[in-house]
């Protein structure tokens, strides 16, 4: 069942670090079957914390998304942005159609 990796960025203090993270992370995420659905774009928040950037990836399965996030390669990529980025991140299984 398709699964979604949702990242809500609350603060980004270094666009350079975020770019380096993206350069490393995107090929890793794609290697697990991830396909970008949302990467930035217009955002209007109606409740909750202010979100400055939203990223959503679609994965073939829940296990693929979890395996990607828990992989050594992905964790290594995240080190580029973790100290200059505050985000909330969720992995959510979609509906079966």
Task: Identify the meaning behind each predicted range.
Residues 1-54, 59-70, 93-97:
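Short S/T/G/P-rich N-terminal loop/turn motif that feeds into the first structured element of a domain
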Residues 65-90:
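C-terminal structural segments of small proteins and small subunits
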């Amino acid at each position: 069942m398709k699964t979604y990796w949702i990242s809500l960025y609350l603060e980004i203090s270094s666009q350079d670090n975020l770019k380096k993270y993206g350069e490393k992370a995107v090929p890793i995420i794609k290697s697990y079957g991830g396909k970008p659905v949302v990467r930035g774009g217009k955002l209007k928040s109606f409740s909750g914390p202010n979100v400055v950037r939203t990223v959503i990836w679609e994965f073939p399965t829940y296990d693929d998304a979890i395996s990607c996030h828990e992989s050594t390669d992905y964790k290594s990529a995240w080190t580029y942005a973790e100290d200059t980025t505050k985000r909330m991140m969720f992995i959510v299984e979609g509906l079966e159609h």
